[in-house]
Regions:
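WD40-repeat beta-propeller superdomains and closely related acidic/aromatic-rich repeat-like regions
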Residues: 1-331
């Protein structure tokens, strides 16, 4: 296959590892491991120095056209399309800002710092939630009301804007890392330290177990309807079916995009059953579920794909890797 980046895309030399890529309107923001944010919009290409150290996480601001980034400098920065960068929460902590999630539906922003989730409403810190151990991951539901946090021994669900909410505990022994909520908040899924997923169906708290991965899952992506959950951590994407009351229990996953390289990133198209898959060797593919038709977005490079993001209209996809190679491909 000829890589689509050469036919209908553009290559970018990012200059540092890509922490994440996010589309905000027509602008693509690459958050980088050296503290910079690179903004590409048409012919415009702007670089902002948002942090003094590495950017560890990023999410679009829920109320403005800008990107929120968390760094190892303990700060949260807001970078606009113009390249202007300002403090959203300066010197928030001496600890790293490991996780950031936000919701345009509710306006809430949540930052994971050590054992605390710090909640912002309209840009103002309102309260903090404590957890029994360091937070492994944060996730909000589609309405931005429920906040899931993973930690040692399970996960906890809270109403994000209810400062006195004691939370719903979802126990399961072991270390829980990344976490995701299904679009309708019926399922909470965590990545475990031992190369497996654990999940709970709500409100019954029914336990789900999904194992057999050769590596840890670090990337999740739900399709728009919440019928499929794509995951990384194998030599294909592992896509679990969540239609029906029992979710994936007793059902085999789909395994699109089989290659001799670990999948490191997955991203569903915003409206169709089309999955973008990034690999440890730097390659990226597109697979359509209806006929398993594949398209090579980019060829292998020198580093694992760490960033995959669709534009809202599903016509462009951004790719970034840990070696500093980036691309925007029209599909």
């Amino acid at each position: 296959m000829n890589a689509e980046v050469y036919n209908n895309g553009s290559r970018l030399a990012l200059g540092a590892s890509a922490t994440t890529a996010q589309w905000i309107g027509d602008a693509c923001y690459f958050a980088l491991g050296d503290g910079r944010v690179r903004i590409v919009e048409g012919d415009k290409d702007v670089i902002a120095q948002a942090h003094g150290g590495a950017i560890l996480c990023a999410t679009p601001h829920p109320r403005s056209d800008g990107l929120l980034t968390g760094g190892d400098d303990g700060c949260i920065a807001l970078t606009l399309a113009s390249g202007a960068s300002e403090a959203f929460a300066p010197a928030l902590s001496k600890k790293w800002i490991d996780h950031l999630v936000a919701s345009p539906a509710s306006g809430v922003v949540a930052a994971g710092v050590g054992k605390q989730a710090i909640i912002f409403d309209d840009g103002i810190e309102t309260h903090r939630f404590g957890y029994p151990s360091t937070i492994g991951g944060l996730a909000l539901d589609a309405k931005g009301r429920k906040l899931a946090a993973s930690h040692y021994g399970g996960a906890t669900i809270r109403l994000a804007l209810a400062a006195d909410d004691k939370g719903v505990s979802l126990p399961w022994s072991g270390s829980h890392l990344a976490v995701t909520l299904s679009p309708g908040a019926e399922y909470v899924i965590t990545a475990m330290q031992e190369n497996a997923l654990h999940g709970w169906r709500l409100p019954e708290k029914t336990d789900l177990r999904m194992d057999g991965y050769p590596a840890k899952t670090r990337s999740f992506s739900w399709d728009k309807r919440g019928r499929w959950l794509a995951t990384s951590g194998a030599e294909s994407a592992i896509v679990w079916p969540f239609a029906g009351k029992l979710g994936p229990q007793g059902k085999p996953p789909l395994q699109p995009g089989q290659r001799q390289a670990l999948v490191t990133a997955v991203a569903f198209h915003p409206s169709e059953e089309v999955l973008a898959i990034g690999y440890a060797d730097g390659a990226a593919l597109l697979v359509r579920f209806a006929d398993q038709l594949g398209m090579e977005l980019d060829e292998p490079g020198e580093g694992a794909v760490t960033a995959l993001a669709w534009s809202a209209d599903g016509k462009r996809i951004a790719i970034g890797d840990e070696a500093g190679r980036g691309a925007i491909v029209n599909v």
